[in-house]
Amino acid sequence: APEMIHNAAQHKPYACFVRPDATIPFMAMPDAVKALLGLAAAPLSALTQRVYNVTSFSPSAANIAEMVTSEFPDAQITFEPQQQRQEIIDSWPAEVDDSQARKDWNWHPDYSFTATFKDYLIPNIRAHYAK
């Protein structure tokens, strides 16, 4: 996702290395930090396990490309899957179950798919190239 945005912000074409339907769990960095701090602050008595999954959303590569082109209408994004990289993505789960974290220490992400891109990633990457 960041590579797509960086290329779009620089008016460069981007060839995505996975299929459009490739899906992976995703979260904004502020939510990752929030999860670490939330787990560290949780009362030990509330924790039912030592390891927790946390997630926010699971977009496909096509979902990400659509979001990027909605913000950068001249973006040129194509899909040219590379077998080795596609196999890595295919070996990962498309979604992560974070229900135990939600139950034990009230985990919930602040950033939705749209907010991650429109309020966090895209503005920060645009600002980087505006310098």
Model feature map: region roles:
Residues 17-20, 25-131:
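C-terminal substrate-binding subdomain of Rossmann-fold SDR/epimerase-dehydratase oxidoreductases
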Residues 1-15, 25-26:
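Oxidoreductase cofactor-interface core, primarily capturing Rossmann-like NAD(P)-dependent enzymes
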